[in-house]
Amino acid sequence: MEDVVKALAKEVLSSADIEWNPPPGLLRRESSRYAGFTKTGSLAVVSSKARARRPDRTRVKYLRDEGFDRLVVDAWDYVVKASFYAVERCVGSGDRRFRILALVEKSYPHLALMSHLNFFPCGSTGSYDMVTIDVPSYSDVWMLVERRSNSTLVLGSDYYGELKMSFLRLAMNEARDRHLGVGLHAASKLYRVRVEGSMREVGVLVFGLSGTGKTTLTVEDHGLREPEYVRVMQDDIVILDWRGVAHGTEMNLYPKTDSVPELKKLEPAVLHPDAVLENVVVKSDGTPDFTDLSLTRNARALAIREAIPIASGSVDLMGTNVLVFLTRRPEMPPLARLTSPYQAVAYFMLGESFRTSAEAGKPEPVRVPGFDPFMLEPKWRSAYSLLDLIKSLNMNVYVMNTGHAKDRKIPPELSKHLLLSLVKENVDWKLDKHMGFEIAVRAGGVNLDGYNPEELYGESYVRVVDLLRRDRQEFLRSIPSVSFLADYV
């Protein structure tokens, strides 16, 4: 059957019990039947079905997939008998926006509320770029993504991350495939700093898998004082167009909350009365305990972006100058500058780090092309699109190691210092002939010799780098149509 999820959505819209665009106050009241509140008024929800994404239960249908169709047909009667809230919003607010419809099972009003809060208002037209049907009460767990129709069926999960990413996954790839730009799993921020005596605005995109410090570096203001400043646009997904504009996709934020005690700038956004805490332990007096991970290591919040002191008035970054890829690999220096657009895209497609799984908490080496677990096929299109953008916009691209250089820990304060130093162009570089990129040897007055992997590994460095290079080349050659990038690592 072609476009079976789209057909299911059509039947739901024609026959199911649907309440259209319920106001947030109603959704909050309905959610309070099973949720609590913090002392500041934030809604606090504990998921009953799922507390993290399930990539192993996510299935994407591109053209024909009989197994996919059977899963949808098996759920058909159950879905059409359910009652739904219909939430009409937009991913993005500018000329790269997509109209979306979330059909959320009525028994889970907090999911409808979070969708309303997270995405932008854009009126009711009856025509949508993406549609998701979300039925958490279903007995089996599946995220069924139908690429051609841009429709998703979420079954058996009440974790908001699945609903949110059902739209953002498709928006990123739709932007790429429509040649509107390229969707990127990256945070965006603007620096206004003094460079060589004159004020300059520098737009930065920060990429990184979970656990690499992306949120920490995104909300960092470096203690700058007027006329210098930092403004935060987005923390997760942007669409970078051919003019260098990084279009924001979300009105608010969805951060992990275990970082809140260290990132005080996030606190007002997470504790805002309109915020929604998801699987955060709340004490009997209404105080959230962000350090208690007994419910899950993946506790999150739908946080109110405008409450962050350094939030920008706009979610769109109007000019992108710098890309920063965060990694945690012991062979990498604290900061490296990539020397060509091809090398930059090679590292983009490597998407490598050590990361901690959301539930198990066990560090493991990983490679995810584009630092983006939501990138759909054909992945080579993202590589070629970014290559064209880096060439045409003359962007500088860096790799920042936020883990260890060999076994020496790289402190977060050093990473923050390096980010500001590269934005201010206050870094001395030296070519690492073995790696083929430039490494920072001094930044903003700080000597980095003690973190140079070549010195730390000593005589074994060449062997370590050679093994790493061969491993990287093998990975890149496994991605169709980008094997040529193996020559640049």
Swiss-Prot record:
Catalysis: reaction(s): oxaloacetate + ATP = phosphoenolpyruvate + ADP + CO2
Binding site for ATP: 185, 208-216, 258, 300, 409-410, 415
Keywords: ATP-binding, Cytoplasm, Decarboxylase, Gluconeogenesis, Lyase, Nucleotide-binding
Top EC class of this enzyme: lyase
Name of this protein: Phosphoenolpyruvate carboxykinase (ATP)
Residues bound to substrate: 53, 159, 300
Any coiled-coil regions, as ranges: none
Enzyme Commission number: 4.1.1.49
Keyword Cytoplasm found: yes
HAMAP family (alphabetical): PEPCK_ATP
Annotated InterPro entries: PEP_carboxykinase_ATP (IPR001272), PEP_carboxykinase_C (IPR013035), PEP_carboxykinase_N (IPR008210)
Entries under Gene3D superfamilies matching the protein: 3.90.228.20
Gene: pckA
Listed GO biological process terms: gluconeogenesis
Localization, UniProt: Cytoplasm
GO molecular function (one): ATP binding
Function: Involved in the gluconeogenesis. Catalyzes the conversion of oxaloacetate (OAA) to phosphoenolpyruvate (PEP) through direct phosphoryl transfer between the nucleoside triphosphate and OAA.
Pfam families per the UniProt record, alphabetical: PEPCK_ATP (PF01293)
Keyword Nucleotide-binding: yes
Pathway(s) it belongs to: Carbohydrate biosynthesis; gluconeogenesis
Family: Belongs to the phosphoenolpyruvate carboxykinase (ATP) family.
